[in-house]
């Protein structure tokens, strides 16, 4: 190795080492080109002619019962193993189809009453329930009443009773619905009715404005008036539901509370006066009553001798006098009494 080799010998004796780079393994996502094999009589350089696509044949895999997959699950195979194409066609399931035959009737399917008379079959039979036992006992007691004991055992519920119970639930329970023990359930499922007689409004708060439960009260705290369901149904039947009447929302004025006769003399007003408690009298009647007592004739409050002219009443009386007959109908007077002018 220490000797120097000649150039001709060096070429023959030198060993060359070739290092091959590994190919990329991440090219799985690349799009593969179709394999084109040129025909032997044609050159591969011709771009005008098309290329032949070689498709690999699908291998037939032997069915393995230990391997399960969702693909091709619709095919039913009779046995494990290969099947011929004819056998596969025979074993393929036919397309499912549902065919209904018309009854040529417009009636709905099912019972004619749409199940309104359906019976709850989980309860005890009518011939064996507590109601039937009670009715049989009542019938036997009626037959044995007034007879001697015949020494016949009729069951634990049918012992002869020599005294008829009265004023008790058992004595008055001819139907058996008010006695103790189980009660027979309704026969039909649609027999349950709930009446709307519970407005769920706090009665204490509605009447007094105060409730001892406070915010924890489960009823509505409202002092308004509500209509029950039966009242709404009655208005619907009479055709009055939803009809708003203006007079229900009119606020009465103070003039409507003014009387048209004096409280003391029961006659039409002459020089009307009004007290502090808003009561109207004739001037002469008020002064005459004040000589007896300083209190009001109606409410017995202290007037202190203060009588003011009733200007509102005077204006109302003049208005009704001007209307003529309308005013006479609103202010009826005695037929034998003459009209007294207002000064």
UniProtKB/Swiss-Prot annotation:
Its EC number is 2.3.2.27. Residues 22-96, 322-343 are annotated as: Disordered. A zinc finger (C3H1-type) spans 196-224. It catalyses: S-ubiquitinyl-[E2 ubiquitin-conjugating enzyme]-L-cysteine + [acceptor protein]-L-lysine = [E2 ubiquitin-conjugating enzyme]-L-cysteine + N(6)-ubiquitinyl-[acceptor protein]-L-lysine. InterPro entries: CWC24-like (IPR039971), Znf_CCCH (IPR000571), Znf_CCCH_sf (IPR036855), Znf_RING (IPR001841), Znf_RING/FYVE/PHD (IPR013083), Znf_RING_CS (IPR017907). Residues 22-33 have a biased composition (Basic residues). Residues 41-50 have a biased composition (Low complexity). Changing residue 277 to A: Loss of E3 ubiquitin ligase activity. PROSITE patterns: ZF_C3H1, ZF_RING_1, ZF_RING_2. The modification N-acetylalanine is found at residue 2. One of its GO terms (cellular component) is nucleus. Residues 84-93, 331-343 have a biased composition (Acidic residues). Pathway: Protein modification; protein ubiquitination. Residues 2-60 are annotated as: Important for interaction with SNRNP200/BRR2. The modification Phosphoserine is found at residues 6, 84-85, 253. A zinc finger (RING-type) spans 262-300. Residues 50-61 are annotated as: Important for interaction with CXCR4. Transmembrane segments: none annotated. GO terms for biological process: DNA repair; mRNA splicing, via spliceosome; negative regulation of chemokine-mediated signaling pathway; protein ubiquitination; snoRNA splicing. Keywords: Acetylation, DNA damage, DNA repair, Metal-binding, mRNA processing, mRNA splicing, Nucleus, Phosphoprotein, Spliceosome, Transferase, Ubl conjugation pathway, Zinc, Zinc-finger. GO terms for molecular function: ubiquitin protein ligase activity; zinc ion binding. It is an enzyme of class 2 (transferase). Component of pre-catalytic and catalytic spliceosome complexes. Interacts (via N-terminus) with the spliceosome subunit SNRNP200/BRR2. Component of the minor spliceosome, which splices U12-type introns. Within this complex, interacts with SCNM1 and CRIPT. It is linked to Trichothiodystrophy 5, non-photosensitive: An X-linked form of trichothiodystrophy, a disease characterized by sulfur-deficient brittle hair and multisystem variable abnormalities. The spectrum of clinical features varies from mild disease with only hair involvement to severe disease with cutaneous, neurologic and profound developmental defects. Ichthyosis, intellectual and developmental disabilities, decreased fertility, abnormal characteristics at birth, ocular abnormalities, short stature, and infections are common manifestations. Required for pre-mRNA splicing as component of the spliceosome. As a component of the minor spliceosome, involved in the splicing of U12-type introns in pre-mRNAs. E3 ubiquitin-protein ligase that catalyzes the transfer of ubiquitin onto target proteins. Catalyzes polyubiquitination of SNRNP200/BRR2 with non-canonical 'Lys-63'-linked polyubiquitin chains. Plays a role in DNA repair via its role in the synthesis of 'Lys-63'-linked polyubiquitin chains that recruit ALKBH3 and the ASCC complex to sites of DNA damage by alkylating agents. This is E3 ubiquitin-protein ligase RNF113A. It comes from Homo sapiens (Human).
